Amino acid sequence: MANFTAADVKRLRELTGAGMLACKNALAETDGDFDKAVEALRIKGAKDVGKRAERATAEGLVAAKDGALIELNCETDFVAKNAEFQTLADQVVAAAAAAKPADVDALKGASIGDKTVEQAIAELSAKIGEKLELRRVAIFDGTVEAYLHRRSADLPPAVGVLVEYRGDDAAAAHAVALQIAALRARYLSRDDVPEDIVASERRIAEETARAEGKPEQALPKIVEGRLNGFFKDAVLLEQASVSDNKKTVKALLDVAGVTVTRFVRFEVGQA
């Protein structure tokens, strides 16, 4: 008996963009395990599976202030454009910058005037008739560069980046923030990539090469090449710079005398 339902198939299709039959077969092959089903679809070459599986359904905005970054969600872009909603986001990120909370729950208890953040969100939610959610928060100390990006002129910022760094070249730090916003780096260095992610990418590269009919003796070299391609895409320091694609981000930072210690990227609608 299958360990999944028609609703599961529909959900996997929405997450990955793969066809209904492909999703059904992937769930059957993996005994209903969603993560393994996504991996199976990637091996079989379903288009854009990895990227679309990271997406979530949400509207809203990101806001930054003094080393704090928040994501505040709503249900429609109509509310995202609402001045009261945007004012609330500014108040929430100011509260985050002042209180430096460890997580979302702690931020909900921080103060906005005579109310808590949680109360302020609940009151506006009741007023405008949409569910509002404080989704996540990041707090960085030290020297920080923030960047917010709008998808269109009539919408509030949907992508936010914080970069914590050492060095005196603020322009270089700003360029890195733009890089992260545009190319969606997930890790700072190769050492930061979890072992299970590397193992999964290696397995996918190997099985994909086999499915393409590559000779067995050539697999190790092919797999290493594709794994290096993954690192160049996912690791910030190994990405080609958007300002000079003949050089890596690391090479340009070395010239500028800047060391990035950590970064975070929030995007509305992304997991």
From Swiss-Prot:
Keywords: Cytoplasm, Elongation factor, Protein biosynthesis. The keyword Lipid metabolism does not apply. One of its GO terms (cellular component) is peptidoglycan-based cell wall. It is found in: Cytoplasm. CDD domains: UBA_EF-Ts. The keyword RNA-binding does not apply. GO terms for biological process: translational elongation. Pfam families: EF_TS (PF00889). Gene3D superfamilies: 1.10.286.20, DNA helicase RuvA subunit, C-terminal domain, Elongation factor Ts, dimerisation domain. InterPro entries: EF-Ts_dimer_sf, Transl_elong_EFTs/EF1B, Transl_elong_EFTs/EF1B_dimer, Transl_elong_Ts_CS, UBA-like_sf. Residues 76-79 are annotated as: Involved in Mg(2+) ion dislocation from EF-Tu. SUPFAM superfamilies: Elongation factor Ts (EF-Ts), dimerisation domain (SSF54713), UBA-like (SSF46934). One of its GO terms (molecular function) is translation elongation factor activity. Was identified as a high-confidence drug target. Belongs to the EF-Ts family. Associates with the EF-Tu.GDP complex and induces the exchange of GDP to GTP. It remains bound to the aminoacyl-tRNA.EF-Tu.GTP complex up to the GTP hydrolysis stage on the ribosome. This is Elongation factor Ts. It comes from Mycobacterium tuberculosis (strain ATCC 25618 / H37Rv).
